[in-house]
Curated annotation (Swiss-Prot):
GO terms for cellular component: plasma membrane. It is a peripheral membrane protein. It is found in: Cell inner membrane. It holds the Pfam family YidD. Could be involved in insertion of integral membrane proteins into the membrane. InterPro entries: Membr_insert_effic_factor_YidD. Belongs to the UPF0161 family. This is Putative membrane protein insertion efficiency factor. Keywords: Cell inner membrane, Cell membrane, Membrane. PANTHER family: MEMBRANE PROTEIN INSERTION EFFICIENCY FACTOR-RELATED (PTHR33383:SF1). The keyword Transport does not apply. It comes from the Bacteria.
Amino acid sequence: MIRSIFLGLIRFYQIVLSPLKGPRCRFLPTCSQYAYEAIERYGIWRGLFLGGKRLLRCHPFHAGGYDPVPRPSANNHPSR
């Protein structure tokens, strides 16, 4: 349930708020899409952690570029 709430908040941001700001993210996928995919793939806590780390890298002094959500390894199990 918490997961659905966070995913809904991210979608709201993407559909309503982000278009008002214009394209500013230096990464592909965008930071909001990265957080959405991370939460879908790893669950709420690890997804928020990965999304937060990404947001900390999204600044003018970072080159940006293609930075997908890491694939789960054999040791990583999704926590839902």
